[in-house]
Amino acid sequence: MDYQNTLLYLYNSVPMFQQVGSSAYKEGLENTLALDEHFGHPHQNFHSIHVGGTNGKGSCSHTLAAILQEAGYRVGLYTSPHLVDFRERIRINGQPIPEEYVVRFVEKERDFFEPLHPSFFELTTAMAFRYFADEHVDVAVIEVGLGGRLDCTNIVHPDPVSYTHLRAHETLSD
């Protein structure tokens, strides 16, 4: 499978919030925890900064990553959504995840994750954490996805947490 076919597989086989709406949202962290266990808890191999809020998460995340990189750290950055290419979501020191890594990850792990029926965000989060661990980042800046206590990025144990402006609707009941 090449990169374009891998993306088609991901976009068409894994429920994606931008395409199917709230039905892509998975209640609970069971899939996230199963993926995390399968990959050996990769998020425990690097420090993390968790960024949440209503507006400005992406800008805040990119700024934090740039500051840390300038300070000499090897920095992972995980944001969503992407604007042009899927690889924008997962970066190390500003460089997008290689196409080959995305293809290899899906080909190698497909038999494990297909029966779980993870959401697009659950799977891409697992891919990001695995990539950051494989590439030995010092710190990863992780942008919250849909938010709330059941957001799959919440498995990280961040050193600092950053919240941008919060509005009342951001409580998500939790």
Predicted regions and their residues:
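ATP-dependent carboxylate-amine ligase catalytic core
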Residues: S22-L29, L33-Q44, E70-H157
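Single conserved hydrophobic/aromatic residue that forms the stacking wall/gate
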Residues: H165-D174
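Flexible, active-site-proximal loop/turn residues at the rims of small-molecule/cofactor binding pockets
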Residues: M16, L146, R167
